[in-house]
A protein has these predicted regions:
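The catalytic "switch" region of P-loop NTPases
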Residues: 170-174, 183-266
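Post-Walker A helix-loop "phosphate-sensing" segment adjacent to the P-loop in P-loop NTPases
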Residues: 94-105, 135-137
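Conserved NTP-binding/hydrolysis module of P-loop NTPases
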Residues: 111, 116-138
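Walker A/P-loop nucleotide-binding motif
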Residues: 68-90
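C-terminal alpha-helical "lid" subdomain
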Residues: 1-24, 109, 240-330
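Conserved P-loop NTPase "ATPase switch" module shared by AAA+ and STAND
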Residues: 154-177
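Walker A/P-loop-proximal flanking segment of P-loop NTPase domains
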Residues: 1-73
């Protein structure tokens, strides 16, 4: 009986380690966890993300001492898993470090990040902001206007410098509650309640286009565009530098004893195809592949692990429909 061909091609075979996971020893579990934390929570310096952080720090500086006056906001739209949320987390960490460097006490409320939900109405949005501000009465049965005024009071009392609303694409839906939240975001800026940064995926672009009055208050859009190594030498260098930094981090943190050769031309080409040039997606793919490589006792992340991660994660996430780490079936 003929063997059925794999439509994605012939997968590479493991070079080191086992094909499947080994018994979970303490050492294996510790290294797999370290790999996950490094790749999901760690920061790799990347020029386009640095530019966004610098722009938002400038925005913070421009708005200090201006509460109660009309404020502009900022917005960032880019594909899912492109690195937006990690950039916002790094912004928060760097502003906290700047505060300490100035001799000021730490302020956990300096930057407040709220993730919007597709079901969130205006009152729910306000309550989520107040919950992040540790308001004991965030869920009190009061009007949205009262909640809005409480937010203004808490922002001043807690010295909030930025409010970041993530996943704003959920406001794109055609519903009264979504429109109400959108209208009040404009009021947030007009009243100078708090400096506001709106972050969303590619679906947020039509939302901003359809809400011109809000978009006009948000200045020039911040861009975290995908790299184009095939068409730009500078982008090729940035992409290789980022992948190399991930490889170095895996060795420096003693997760693997050997290089994963992420900067070889063949691997770079495959990573580019999987990620479409979004470095955040490269890190996300590695966050799936690296722990799996640890668990099977491999000396590094191999094409076998990257192929499995592509098939089991990236294709399912809708990033692509092929596996560039596999060899096309004859």
């Amino acid at each position: 009986m003929a063997t059925k061909k794999d439509p994605l091609g012939v997968q590479p075979k493991p070079i080191t380690g086992s094909r499947t996971s080994l018994p979970r020893t303490h050492e294996i579990k510790a290294r797999a966890l370290a790999a996950t934390r490094l790749l999901e929570d760690g920061w790799v310096e990347h020029d386009p993300q640095r530019a966004i952080i610098d722009d938002l720090i400038d925005y913070r500086d421009q708005t200090i001492g201006r509460l109660g006056n009309p404020l502009s906001g900022r917005r960032l739209s880019q594909f899912s898993q492109a690195g937006k949320s990690k950039t916002m987390a790094q912004l928060k960490a760097e502003l906290a470090a700047l505060r300490v460097a100035l001799g000021l006490p730490p302020n956990p409320y300096q930057v407040v990040i709220v993730e919007l939900d597709r079901r969130l109405n205006l009152k729910g949005f306000y309550q989520e902001v107040l919950r992040k501000l540790d308001d004991d009465f965030w869920d009190a049965d009061v009007s949205a206007k009262v909640l809005e005024n409480r937010i203004a009071d808490f922002v001043r009392k807690l010295d909030v410098e930025l409010l970041i609303a993530d996943e704003v694409q959920h406001l794109r839906r055609k519903a009264n509650d979504a429109n109400e939240v959108t209208d009040r975001l404009k009021v947030f800026l007009d009243r100078g309640i708090v400096p506001l940064v709106l972050v969303g995926d590619e679906d947020s672009v039509p939302f901003f286009r359809a809400n011109g009055k809000l978009a006009a208050r948000l200045g020039n859009p911040l861009e975290l565009a995908p790299l184009n190594p095939k068409g730009s030498v500078a982008d090729a260098k940035l992409f290789k530098k980022f992948c190399g930094a991930l490889d170095e981090g895996l060795m420096k943190n003693r997760i693997f004893p050997s290089s994963s050769m992420l900067t070889s031309n063949k691997t770079l080409d495959a990573l580019l195809e999987v990620s479409s040039g979004h470095v955040g997606r490269v890190a996300r793919l590695l966050s799936v592949a690296a722990p799996a490589a640890v668990r099977r006792g491999a000396a590094c992340v191999e094409p076998y692990d990257l192929s499995r991660a592509t098939r089991e994660f990236a294709i399912g996430a809708g990033w692509l429909v092929t596996d560039p780490f596999s060899i096309a079936a004859p």
